[in-house]
């Protein structure tokens, strides 16, 4: 709800502030009070997991048929177990790549294409030409092959620019699957419905695992060893995630910023959910906690510039962040002093958590926050001036205020040896994959949020920029920007097929940032309005465990 408030400046001047009141935290102290897994129970689960992992390794050794190897790899990935079997999957992919596929049907060709593309193999989409007639149309004999169509549908979303056959495949398979949906038996109908809502490649891993395990359980051809391992692994990781979100919630409560800055969104659990979408594996625990804290403070910053501060107050805060020293607090408006000092202290705490040879990472993150604050200030100026920039000019600033340059940098700070000084130099160089991810984030946010924000006298979003530049309605502008979102996905796919100077897991983190946007901002801003779908998803991942 929008409201107005007044603040005295000196003895005379009054400031009329526009501020948006957000709903309070959905979760409060829930994760401090509730913890489900006892130490002895966890110890038994870990022992059983190790036994099951040995059995699955034996499956890799005993499976020689290429199709069965593909199904095994696919199942393990869909169930979130691939981080246990990286060596085995790497060897399996080489076999899959070298296999003779001459006699493969739609299901097999599509599955192979998707698995290999997901892992950076630049496989040609020409493999699908044999499923077209001499007029370039997909063969009518494919129409009833639901499993083949679903695999082609999911494979086609790994397409890059100029791969028109994959664009055609999406249109064809989507139409066919929608028409078949009412005739399909379970669990295939649920699986098709799940991926029609959001394609496999664009889904966040943890939420996919939580929704796919019940589907896999109903499959006739399921492997019960893999199923049990998936459930136990999910529960063990959930226990770890509960510990982390408890720790972060305690930190957030001690910070108490949303008690003094009541105009800011209180969304620390949702921030943690966001980062679990980026990396969920146990080896990233330190990184998750650091990044969740960093993004929570970025959210407060966003609301300060966006919802409450005057232009002069924004300027003073920006200058203080530029200086990044405790003495600069004297220049910050009174109501922001606590925020400023706690921002600096949190980053000092980050530095203290790092090993001596890792401390060089913090200045890179500090610089990204400085760049972010300057961009926030530029948007604040546009708002005061009622300036509507052209789309290209807008994106030069708003791809930064999307926050993903800073979040990407933060997500690398707590990593182990994979993140090097060259990694942080690479982020600072604004690589194409990170630009595409940031623009994707900005456009999805604006498409979803622009109407609500314009109702409260917000500065122009990319939607308004497009409307002004092209003389269109908001509806048409959103449709055109959605086309740009699809183009950004193709940019991301293309960059994943090119050699880079950073390790593949670090590229995957950037992809996962875009997947998080698909989850959180598709159709609705569920971060701001977190008592809707977001609440259900948080519960699915952090509260509801599997019965074994």
Swiss-Prot record:
<dbReference type="InterPro" id="IPR008949">
    <property type="entry name" value="Isoprenoid_synthase_dom_sf"/>
</dbReference>
<feature type="binding site">
    <location>
        <position position="306"/>
    </location>
    <ligand>
        <name>Mg(2+) 2</name>
    </ligand>
</feature>
<dbReference type="GO" id="GO:0016102">
    <property type="term" value="P:diterpenoid biosynthetic process"/>
</dbReference>
<dbReference type="InterPro" id="IPR008930">
    <property type="entry name" value="Terpenoid_cyclase/PrenylTrfase"/>
</dbReference>
<feature type="binding site">
    <location>
        <position position="453"/>
    </location>
    <ligand>
        <name>Mg(2+) 3</name>
    </ligand>
</feature>
<keyword id="KW-0479">Metal-binding</keyword>
<dbReference type="Pfam" id="PF01397">
    <property type="entry name" value="Terpene_synth"/>
</dbReference>
<feature type="binding site">
    <location>
        <position position="306"/>
    </location>
    <ligand>
        <name>Mg(2+) 1</name>
    </ligand>
</feature>
<dbReference type="InterPro" id="IPR050148">
    <property type="entry name" value="Terpene_synthase-like"/>
</dbReference>
<feature type="binding site">
    <location>
        <position position="302"/>
    </location>
    <ligand>
        <name>Mg(2+) 2</name>
    </ligand>
</feature>
<dbReference type="InterPro" id="IPR036965">
    <property type="entry name" value="Terpene_synth_N_sf"/>
</dbReference>
<comment type="similarity">
    <text>Belongs to the terpene synthase family.</text>
</comment>
<protein>
    <recommendedName>
        <fullName>Alpha-humulene synthase</fullName>
        <ecNumber>4.2.3.104</ecNumber>
    </recommendedName>
</protein>
<keyword id="KW-0460">Magnesium</keyword>
<feature type="short sequence motif" description="DDXXD motif">
    <location>
        <begin position="302"/>
        <end position="306"/>
    </location>
</feature>
<dbReference type="Pfam" id="PF03936">
    <property type="entry name" value="Terpene_synth_C"/>
</dbReference>
<dbReference type="InterPro" id="IPR001906">
    <property type="entry name" value="Terpene_synth_N"/>
</dbReference>
<keyword id="KW-0456">Lyase</keyword>
<dbReference type="InterPro" id="IPR005630">
    <property type="entry name" value="Terpene_synthase_metal-bd"/>
</dbReference>
<dbReference type="GO" id="GO:0080017">
    <property type="term" value="F:alpha-humulene synthase activity"/>
</dbReference>
<feature type="binding site">
    <location>
        <position position="302"/>
    </location>
    <ligand>
        <name>Mg(2+) 1</name>
    </ligand>
</feature>
<dbReference type="InterPro" id="IPR044814">
    <property type="entry name" value="Terpene_cyclase_plant_C1"/>
</dbReference>
<comment type="function">
    <text>Catalyzes the formation of alpha-humulene in the first step of zerumbone biosynthesis, a highly promising multi-anticancer agent. Also mediates formation of beta-caryophyllene at a much lower level.</text>
</comment>
<dbReference type="GO" id="GO:0000287">
    <property type="term" value="F:magnesium ion binding"/>
</dbReference>
<dbReference type="InterPro" id="IPR034741">
    <property type="entry name" value="Terpene_cyclase-like_1_C"/>
</dbReference>
């Amino acid at each position: 709800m929008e409201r107005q408030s007044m603040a005295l400046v000196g003895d005379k001047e009054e400031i009329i502030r526009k501020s948006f009141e957000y709903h309070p935290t959905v979760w409060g102290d829930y994760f401090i009070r509730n913890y489900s897994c006892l130490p002895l129970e966890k110890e038994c689960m870990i022992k059983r997991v190790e036994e099951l992992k040995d059995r699955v390794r034996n499956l890799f050794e005993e499976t020689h048929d290429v199709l069965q190897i593909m199904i095994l790899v696919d199942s393990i990935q869909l169930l979130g177990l691939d981080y246990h079997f990286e060596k085995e999957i790497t060897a399996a992919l080489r076999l899959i790549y070298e296999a003779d596929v001459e006699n493969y049907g739609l299901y097999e060709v599509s599955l192979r294409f998707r698995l290999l593309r997901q892992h950076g193999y630049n496989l040609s989409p020409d493999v699908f030409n044999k499923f077209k007639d001499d007029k370039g149309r997909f063969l009518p004999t494919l129409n009833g092959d639901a499993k083949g169509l679903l695999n082609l549908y999911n494979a086609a979303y790994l397409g890059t620019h100029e791969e028109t056959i994959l664009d055609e495949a999406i249109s064809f398979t989507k139409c066919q699957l929608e028409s078949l949906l009412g005739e399909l038996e379970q669990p295939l109908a649920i699986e098709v419905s799940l991926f029609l809502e959001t394609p496999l490649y664009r889904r966040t891993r943890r939420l996919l695992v939580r929704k796919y395990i019940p589907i896999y359980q109903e499959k006739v051809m399921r492997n019960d060893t893999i199923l049990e391992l998936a459930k136990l692994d999910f529960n063990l990781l959930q226990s770890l995630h509960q510990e982390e979100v408890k720790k972060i919630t305690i930190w957030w409560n001690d910070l108490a910023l949303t008690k003094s800055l009541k105009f800011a969104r209180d969304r620390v659990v949702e921030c943690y959910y966001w980062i679990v979408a980026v990396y969920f594996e146990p080896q990233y625990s330190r990184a998750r906690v650091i990044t969740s804290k960093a993004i929570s403070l970025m959210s407060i910053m966003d609301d300060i510039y966006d919802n409450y501060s005057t232009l002069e107050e924004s300027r003073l805060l920006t200058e203080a962040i530029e200086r990044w020293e405790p003495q600069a607090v004297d220049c910050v408006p009174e109501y922001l002093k606590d925020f400023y000092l706690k921002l600096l202290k949190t980053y000092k705490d980050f530095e203290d958590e790092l090993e001596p040879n890792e401390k060089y990472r913090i200045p890179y993150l500090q610089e990204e926050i400085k760049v972010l604050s300057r961009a926030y200030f530029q948007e604040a100026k546009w708002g005061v001036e009622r300036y509507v920039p052209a789309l290209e000019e807008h994106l030069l600033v708003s791809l930064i205020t999307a926050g993903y340059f800073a979040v990407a940098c933060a997500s690398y700070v707590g990593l182990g040896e994979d993140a090097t000084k060259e990694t942080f130099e690479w982020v600072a160089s604004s690589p194409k994959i990170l630009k595409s991810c940031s623009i994707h984030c900005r456009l999805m946010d604006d498409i979803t949020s622009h109407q609500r924000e314009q109702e409260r006298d917000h500065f122009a979003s990319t939607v308004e920029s497009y409307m002004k530049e092209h003389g269109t309605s908001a509806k048409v502008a959103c449709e055109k920007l959605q086309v740009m979102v699809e183009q950004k996905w193709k940019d991301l796919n293309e960059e994943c097929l090119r050699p880079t100077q950073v390790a593949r897991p670090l590229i995957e983190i950037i992809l996962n940032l875009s997947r998080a946007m698909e989850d959180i901002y598709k159709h609705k801003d569920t971060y701001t309005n977190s008592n809707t779908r977001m609440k259900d998803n948080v519960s699915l991942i952090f509260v509801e465990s599997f019965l074994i």
